[in-house]
Structure formats: structure tokens, C-alpha cells
Amino acid sequence: MFAVIKTGGKQYRVAANDVLTIEKLEVVAGDTVEFTEVLVIGEGADAAIGAPFVKGASVKAEVVEHNRGKKVIAFKKRRRQNSKRSRGHRQHHTVVRITDIVAAK
């Protein structure tokens, strides 16, 4: 069974026991989270498509850890001005393991 969920402004195709790196969630490692914004749920070629979400469907996941992504450098240089600026940024992420996909009843 698979599902397509929406979280953090992105969509992810998930199945049971998948490990995902998603945008940061304000939860403690070891907690359980439930994603109710399920866009598609199905098994094999049989799928239920929501408009926009599938009613009654949810995906449960366990928070594994919080980490940070690779550093992204934003560098600006103005030629012949002896002017340059470098700024770094690391995005915060949450790693989750999908435990259960619950279809609509």
C-alpha cells in the first residue's frame, strides 16, 4: 500500500517502513505524528485520488531524529568595487519513519 502525503509545502510518495527527510516539525524525537493531508492512497494499480485530500485517510509516522542539511552558500560580488558578501544557510530537517497507512473507512 502506498500514499502521497503533503507536508512542508512538498509532496512525498510513501509506503510502510519508509524513512523520509522532511521539513522541520516541532515534535520531539521518538514521538508519533499523523499526516492527514493525504492526496492519493492505493495499492498496485488501484488508487483513490482526493479532491484535494482523501477523506478519512491518514499516515502515521515515528520521528527518528532532527538534523540539518548541507550548507548553502550565497555569494555576491560587485566587480571592480572591492565589495563581496558571503552568507551561509543550513536548513533544519526532521527524519521520520512511516509506521502505518490508514485508508478511509
From Swiss-Prot:
Keywords for the protein's UniProt record, in alphabetical order: Ribonucleoprotein, Ribosomal protein, RNA-binding, rRNA-binding
GO cellular component, one term: ribonucleoprotein complex
SUPFAM superfamilies: L21p-like
Molecular function terms, GO-annotated: rRNA binding; structural constituent of ribosome
BP GO annotations: translation
Family statement: Belongs to the bacterial ribosomal protein bL21 family.
Protein function: This protein binds to 23S rRNA in the presence of protein L20.
Subunit organization: Part of the 50S ribosomal subunit. Contacts protein L20.
Protein name per its UniProtKB record: Large ribosomal subunit protein bL21
Species of provenance: Rhizobium rhizogenes (strain K84 / ATCC BAA-868) (Agrobacterium radiobacter)
